[in-house]
Amino acid sequence: MAQMTVQIVTPDGLVYDHHAAFVSVKTIDGELGILPRHINTIAVLEVDQVKVRRVDDDKHIDWVAVNGGIIEIADNVITIVADSAERERDIDISRAERAKLRAEQEIEEAHDKHLIDQERRAKIALQRAINRINVGSK
């Protein structure tokens, strides 16, 4: 059975390293499903979840919240380089919910004061918090 090696790396180090039969990511151009022997590719990732079906248990799926980044697929090795990434089991949902509330308040304040850059940063923070909540709830 063909397999791929999946590695997710952040500035803090290696977050994820397993063999996979299937990987799904969301790029800026849309969803990308990856099977072994996939064509070599480099793409920019959205803030979204990464789905990994491991080879050791075809019913088990690992979920990782990735905050953007780049994916490289080459010779059955998938490398994701992201600013931050958290496995489903490592996500503190209550902390993510607090971050979501904080981001919503910051969006409202920035909008009222017409602070475009601050509002944009708060929207990205909100998107990241929602992504963490979604992955942590799986």
From Swiss-Prot:
CDD domains referenced in this protein's UniProt entry, alphabetically: F1-ATPase_delta
Subcellular localization: Cell membrane
One GO MF term: ATP binding
Disulfide bonds: none
Membrane topology: Peripheral membrane protein
Domain of life of the organism encoding this protein: Bacteria
InterPro entries (UniProt xref): ATP_synth_F1_dsu/esu, ATP_synth_F1_dsu/esu_N, ATP_synth_F1_esu_C, ATPsynth_dsu/esu_N
Alphabetic keyword roster: ATP synthesis, Cell membrane, CF(1), Hydrogen ion transport, Ion transport, Membrane, Transport
One Gene Ontology cellular component annotation held by this UniProt entry: proton-transporting ATP synthase complex
Function text: Produces ATP from ADP in the presence of a proton gradient across the membrane.
Similarity annotation: Belongs to the ATPase epsilon chain family.
Record-given protein name: ATP synthase epsilon chain
Organism field: Streptococcus gordonii (strain Challis / ATCC 35105 / BCRC 15272 / CH1 / DL1 / V288)
